[in-house]
Design a protein with these regions (language model features):
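Secretory targeting and sorting signals
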Residues: 1-26
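A generic alpha-helix preference that emphasizes hydrophobic side chains
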Residues: 21-23, 75, 157, 241
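Flexible gly/pro/ser-rich segments immediately N-terminal to CXXCH heme-c attachment motifs
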Residues: 208-225
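Conserved beta-strand position repeated once per blade in WD40 beta-propeller domains
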Residues: 75-77, 157-159, 219-221, 283
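Beta-rich carbohydrate-recognition and catalytic domains
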Residues: 29-71, 80-153, 162-212, 233-284
C-alpha cells in the first residue's frame, strides 16, 4: 500500500480519537448537556500538544447554538464541501425544547445536525455561518431515526466527504447502547445531499450490515486522493481495530466496487479480506 497511505491512515485515526477516552458515556439520555449543572465548567483541560481555544456549540459558545435548540452535541464530523466551506455533522444533539419522552429523553433530542462555516481563523474558535433548521427553527435532524431501543436508538454520522457537487455522510444505525464505550449497530450506510447539506436522502443500497467483514466498517473516516475515496473503518465502539478500503470517486455508492487492503494488496468486493492496519482506535 505504501508508506504514504499508511501515514495518512495513522494521522486520520489519530485525529478521530476522542479526547474523553474509552470510558466516556455514549448514551445521550444519560447526559445533562447544560454546562455548570452537569459539573463541567469552562474549556476542557487537554494534556497533549493541542489546547482548547473555544467552545463550538452550547451556551458558552460564541455561536449561541442554544437559540437553535443545540445545547449539547456529540462528535462533530468536519469536511470540505468542495468549495472551500466546512460542513460539520454533529451526532446526538440535545436542547431545551419539545422533549422526546416516548424515546426516553427529557431533552429535545436529534440524532444528527448540520452546520456550515467559512471561518479561516480558528485561533479563536470556529464561527458558524448557517445552520440547517427544521420548520420550527431548531437544528434539523437531517436523517431521521425512530429512537426505539433495540430497533434503532440513533442514526449517528461518522464521516463526510464531497464528491463533485454531492455531499455524502456515512452514518451508523445504533441498535442499543452497552457499557461505556460500547454499542451495537444494525448497519452503516450513506446519505447524500445535492443542496450543500440542506436536505439528505438515505441510500439503502449502501448499507453494510454489522456482521462479517462489513462489521469492520460500521464507523468511518474518509480521505480523498488521486481519484479515490479511502474509507478507514472500525467495528462499533471504541478502542477497536482500524481497517482501510478504497473506491473510485464516481463509485462511492457501489459497494461491489470497493477494494480492501489485505496487508499485501487490494482485493475487490470482499470486506472480510481487510486486514487491521492499526489497533486501539478511540473512535471514528
Amino acid at each position: 500500500m505504501g508508506s504514504r497511505v499508511l501515514t495518512v491512515a495513522a494521522l486520520t485515526v489519530t485525529a478521530s480519537v476522542l479526547v474523553t477516552g474509552p470510558t466516556a458515556l455514549a448514551d445521550p439520555n444519560a447526559i445533562n448537556p447544560i454546562a455548570g449543572l452537569n459539573g463541567t465548567f469552562g474549556l476542557p483541560q487537554l494534556h497533549g500538544r493541542a489546547q482548547a481555544v473555544a467552545q463550538v456549540t452550547g451556551m458558552s459558545s460564541p455561536n449561541m447554538t442554544q437559540n437553535v435548540t443545540m445545547i449539547g452535541t456529540d462528535l462533530g464530523i468536519m469536511w470540505d464541501n468542495g468549495r472551500g466551506e466546512v460542513l460539520t455533522a454533529f451526532g446526538d444533539t440535545a436542547g431545551v425544547g419539545v422533549p422526546n419522552l416516548l424515546q426516553g429523553s427529557l431533552w429535545s433530542w436529534r440524532s444528527n445536525a448540520i452546520v456550515r462555516s467559512n471561518d479561516r481563523n480558528l485561533a479563536d474558535g470556529m464561527n458558524f455561518d448557517s445552520v440547517v433548521k427544521d420548520a420550527v427553527g431548531q437544528t434539523k435532524e437531517v436523517v431521521p431515526s425512530p429512537k426505539i431501543p433495540f430497533v434503532e436508538i440513533s442514526r449517528i454520522p461518522t464521516a463526510g466527504v464531497a464528491v463533485g457537487d454531492t455531499q455524502y455522510l456515512n452514518l451508523m444505525s445504533v441498535k442499543n447502547w452497552g457499557p461505556a464505550g460500547t454499542w451495537d449497530t444494525n448497519f452503516s450506510g450513506l446519505a447524500a445531499s445535492t443542496d450543500n447539506g440542506e436536505n439528505w436522502a438515505a441510500l439503502p443500497e449502501t448499507h453494510r450490515p454489522s456482521a462479517g467483514g462489513d462489521r469492520n466498517f460500521q464507523q468511518s473516516a474518509y480521505l480523498k486522493d488521486n481519484g479515490y475515496v479511502y474509507q478507514y473503518g472500525t467495528p462499533p465502539g471504541r478502542s477497536t481495530l482500524g481497517h482501510v478500503a478504497r473506491v473510485r470517486d464516481a463509485d462511492i455508492t457501489r459497494l461491489g466496487e470497493y477494494e480492501y487492503w489485505t496487508g499485501k494488496d487490494w482485493k475487490k468486493g470482499d470486506p472480510a479480506a481487510a486486514a487491521p492496519i492499526v489497533d486501539g482506535v478511540g473512535e471514528l
